[in-house]
Regions:
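Nuclease-adjacent, charged terminal/linker segments that flank catalytic cores
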Residues: 1-88
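Short, basic/hydrophobic alpha-helical segments
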Residues: 135, 162-169
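Active-site metal-binding core of divalent-cation-utilizing nuclease and nuclease-like domains
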Residues: 106-142, 150-152
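Active-site-adjacent loop/helix micro-motif of nuclease/hydrolase catalytic cores
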Residues: 150-161
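Acidic-basic catalytic patches of nuclease active cores, encompassing PD-(D/E)XK
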Residues: 80-123
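Acidic-and-aromatic substrate-binding clefts and catalytic sites of carbohydrate-active enzymes
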Residues: 33-38, 123-125, 152-153, 184
Length: 237
């Protein structure tokens, strides 16, 4: 494969990645490509000069945020006509850290056949839409949840039950929760191992309107090994 073909392949991967996640950084995109970011300056500059991407600094960060231009969005639809292109005009720091952490985790995974961002999953009928869905080479569907803060216990159980329902409807096979805090990890794992779980439902999809509705026996989820809980290092701005 010559240099032109290699760069064309890299450009396609970057455009699709940005369409899925909305934004990224040079170092994350380089990790995704499996190359050293230090040698990619000319390549990223060419993407900007070609009108495919734009780069801007966000206050409070050390790195430029890379997004698709409108022409870049059109390019993404050429690569994948059914792709829902995500675009943001503002970049709150918590949104950057959360998304970058998801992307960083994804770049470390081997044997990924396909993946779907939260934006793509919005078109599917998930009870509990995860942050990321990975399909591995064996066809196993793994939901990824990045928890950078401790949610209310009722909300945790509401999400747990949603995962169980999605598993029962064959939308997912497993869930991996990722935590920056070992204390929060231990708390979630403790809640998961309990039996029964308090059951919470909502009639309008709004978690602020959820109410207690009896209990649920999670033993089938425990036996299957539905959920796993791991410590990880979030992306550092």
């Amino acid at each position: 494969m010559n240099t032109f073909d290699i760069n064309a392949q890299k450009r396609e991967k970057i455009v699709i990645w940005l369409a899925k996640f909305g934004f990224s950084t040079r170092d994350l995109l380089s990790k995704m490509l499996g190359v050293n970011v230090d040698g990619q300056g000319a390549f990223f500059k060419k993407l900007v000069e070609s009108g495919i991407t734009k780069e801007e600094y966000v206050p409070g960060t050390r790195k430029r945020v890379i997004t698709l231009t409108p022409d870049g969005g059109q390019q993404a639809r050429i690569y994948q006509p059914d792709l829902e292109v995500k675009s943001l005009r503002k970049f709150p720091l918590h949104t950057l850290i959360h998304s970058y952490s998801i992307q960083s985790f994804l770049t470390t995974q081997k044997g990924v056949k396909d993946f779907f961002s939260e934006t793509e999953l919005a078109k599917r009928k998930f009870i509990r839409r995860p942050d990321l869905l990975i399909v591995n080479d064996a066809g196993v569907k793994i939901a990824i949840e990045v928890e950078l803060t401790q949610k209310d216990v009722n909300r945790v159980y509401f999400n747990f039950y949603g995962h169980v329902q999605d598993w029962q409807q064959e939308r997912i096979d497993h869930v991996i929760y990722l935590f920056s805090s070992p204390t929060v990890l231990a708390r979630y794992e403790e809640l998961y191992q309990k039996n029964p779980w308090p059951k919470f439902i909502t009639t309008d999809g709004n978690v602020r309107h959820m109410s207690r509705s009896g209990s649920v026996d999670p033993s089938h989820a425990h036996t299957h090994g539905l959920m796993y809980f791991h410590k990880f290092e979030p992306y550092a701005l």
